[in-house]
Amino acid sequence: MSPTDMKAVVFYGPHSIAIESRPIPKVQHDKDIVVKVSASGLCGSDLHYFRGHEVVDSAGFIMGHEFVGEVVEAGRAVTTVRPGDKVVSPFTVSCGDCFYCKLQNSSRCVHCQVFGSNGLDGAQAEYVRVPLADSTVVRAPPGLSDDALILMADIFPTGFFGARNAMAGLGAQDPTEAVVVVIGCGPVGLCAIVSALEYRPRVVFAIDSVDSRLGLAEKLGARPLDLKKGVPSIISAVQEVTEGRGADAVVEVVGQGPALRTAYDIIRPFGSISSIGAHHSAMPFSATDGYE
């Protein structure tokens, strides 16, 4: 491999990836940077591509949309970082100036690009190009390991976003009196639990069918509910502590219809469901169900 090439994980279609030599990316526009990757995460949405659950128009792109690394090249218009800085990147590129960015909805930026997609190569490679760097990457605080920093690229912010949205739906209710449920205790679900606990709710239930995940959730401070015992037992446990009303807020982190249906079954009237799982099937309840 020459000094102008790098190794990269390339997606060619469902169940078809390859490690290949690709040219090291260069700055193409004044607001670009190039990052030497030191850590790159594997997201559940990468598995959606791999398993064929999410169809792409064309393949041959480098995967990976959450990463940490060192800036090695910067365009002349970049002002917030410079070569030598360690940075953390979210999964999308954003401009910082459009309608959505100003509302802090940067994932819907009018100039949005997703790393690891047809439009923009990702970071499961030795180097990655980052457009619109000033409004996309964040300089990493000193003293944190790559293992800690990589959580802040996508995993923790997604869990935090889900918990924050669920708690925002409480309205006038005191958060410390709320009963919160997190469905799914994988990495993002555990981060949602940590985030929900910051609101000091009366109880946070954690639902999963994997014993080790339930154990981690319990260590964090959640009350585990084992899905293997059946949904009726979960409904009963939630109703027992809410005088039969149901949960005040639910964060659904699985991305499957049955999980979203469980959220619907355990939420109280006027409760808040925050669904951050990546869904590929029809809604498991109707508008009529919601009205009733």
Swiss-Prot record:
Alphabetically ordered keywords of this record: Metal-binding, NAD, Oxidoreductase, Zinc
Q: Which PROSITE patterns match?
A: ADH_ZINC (PS00059)
Q: Does the keyword Chaperone apply?
A: no
Instruction: List the Gene3D superfamilies hit by this protein, alphabetically.
Output: Medium-chain alcohol dehydrogenases, catalytic domain (3.90.180.10), NAD(P)-binding Rossmann-like Domain (3.40.50.720)
Q: Cofactors per UniProt? A: Zn(2+)
Which residues hold substrate?
49
Kindly list the positions annotated as binding Zn(2+).
43, 65-66
- The enzyme class is oxidoreductase
Q: Which domain of life is it from?
A: Eukaryota
For the ligand (NAD(+)), the binding residues are 184-189, 208, 213, 276-278
What InterPro entries does the database record attribute to this sequence?
Answer: ADH-like_C (IPR013149), ADH-like_N (IPR013154), ADH_Zn_CS (IPR002328), GroES-like_sf (IPR011032), NAD(P)-bd_dom_sf (IPR036291)
Task: Look up the record and name the pathway of this protein.
Answer: Mycotoxin biosynthesis
Q: Does the keyword Thylakoid apply?
A: no
Q: Pfam families recorded for this chain?
A: ADH_N, ADH_zinc_N
Name any one GO molecular function: oxidoreductase activity
What's the stated role of this polypeptide?
A: Medium chain reductase/dehydrogenase; part of the gene cluster that mediates the biosynthesis of UCS1025A, a member of the pyrrolizidinone family that acts as a strong telomerase inhibitor and displays potent antibacterial and antitumor properties. These compounds share a hemiaminal-containing pyrrolizidinone core fused with a gamma-lactone, giving a furopyrrolizidine that is connected to a decalin fragment.
Name by which UniProt lists this protein = Medium chain reductase/dehydrogenase ucsI
